[in-house]
């Protein structure tokens, strides 16, 4: 594990933001058409290619 560069840290921060569930209000607004986030990722199981 070396030092994280600023660019690498920025990419990891973006992946962390993307790794969240679909908000409840979106599910309500779309009448549950949108229920899951296909970009969900587990920190232990899935790789980020970073």
Swiss-Prot record:
GO terms for molecular function: structural constituent of ribosome. One of its GO terms (biological process) is translation. This is Large ribosomal subunit protein eL39. One of its GO terms (cellular component) is cytosolic large ribosomal subunit. Coiled coil: none annotated. Residues 1-12 have a biased composition (Basic residues). Disulfide bonds: none annotated. Residues 1-20, 30-50 are annotated as: Disordered. Keywords: Ribonucleoprotein, Ribosomal protein. The keyword Ribonucleoprotein applies. The gene is rpl39e. Belongs to the eukaryotic ribosomal protein eL39 family. Transmembrane segments: none annotated. Signal peptide: none annotated. HAMAP family: Ribosomal_eL39. Gene3D superfamilies: Ribosomal protein L39e. Pfam families: Ribosomal_L39 (PF00832).
